[in-house]
């Protein structure tokens, strides 16, 4: 849908990094819907480990950018419960590896609530988390579990590969009425590309086709599409 390099001089788009596109999506959705809030470790005054939430605490205050202790299962549960009550939490987990600490809340609660209550309750929450390998991090910080979660009924998994998709898919995930695992990749956080201004939303489940051919189909996601 969008190039992984900037062509903004010839278009109405804005040249942004993946990080900036994510931040723009969060800011726009929080301004658009008072029910959207962010919760996670160091997301407030420290502005997040990778600065995705930079400026949001100052703009929206502590009620909508909520600091959490190092207790992933606890604040994941807060996200699930508040989503069931009508809010739209964006839960930031510092690394995908730490989602395992809260896996009971994700798999047995967030993903199952709609089925357990016959469709009468929904869990409109987003779990934002970076992952990927090749960054010379520890063994517990270098794993990719998206395949696990893609097999969980009721859970949607999103893995953008360009800044435009980062913005458009995050906005779509926040508006979705089911839980979405939004997987970011550390390697492409600083990747720059053209990002449409305004209310740009990319539908979840619609694959981007960067190159059309006739003989072979290669399917990939996240960093694998830009290597």
Located regions from the model:
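Short, flexible active-site loop motifs that bind/organize anionic cofactors or intermediates
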Residues: 5-6, 156, 218
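Short secondary-structure boundary/capping segments
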Residues: 7-8, 117, 208
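Glycine-/acidic-rich phosphate or pyrophosphate-binding loops and their flanking alpha/beta elements
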Residues: 21-25, 167-179, 190-227
């Amino acid at each position: 849908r969008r190039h992984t390099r900037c062509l903004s001089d010839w278009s109405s788009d804005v040249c942004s990094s993946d990080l900036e596109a994510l931040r723009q999506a969060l800011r726009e959705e929080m301004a658009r819907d008072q029910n959207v809030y962010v919760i996670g470790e160091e997301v407030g005054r420290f502005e997040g480990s990778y600065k995705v939430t930079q400026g949001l605490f100052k703009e929206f205050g502590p009620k909508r950018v909520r600091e959490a202790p190092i207790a992933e299962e606890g604040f994941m549960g807060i996200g699930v419960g508040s989503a069931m009550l009508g809010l739209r939490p964006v839960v930031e987990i510092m690394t995908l590896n730490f989602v395992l600490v809260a896996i009971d809340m994700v798999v047995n609660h967030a993903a199952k609530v709609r089925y357990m209550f016959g469709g009468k309750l929904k869990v409109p929450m987003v779990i934002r988390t970076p992952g990927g390998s090749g960054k010379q991090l520890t063994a517990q910080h270098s794993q990719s579990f998206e395949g696990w979660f893609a097999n969980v009924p009721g859970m949607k998994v999103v893995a953008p590969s360009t800044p435009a998709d980062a913005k458009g898919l995050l906005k779509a995930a926040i508006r979705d009425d089911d839980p979405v695992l939004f997987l970011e990749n550390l390697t492409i956080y600083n990747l720059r590309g053209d990002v449409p201004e305004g209310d740009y939303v990319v539908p979840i489940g619609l694959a981007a086709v960067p190159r059309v051919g006739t003989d072979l189909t290669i399917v990939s996601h996240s960093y694998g599409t830009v290597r």
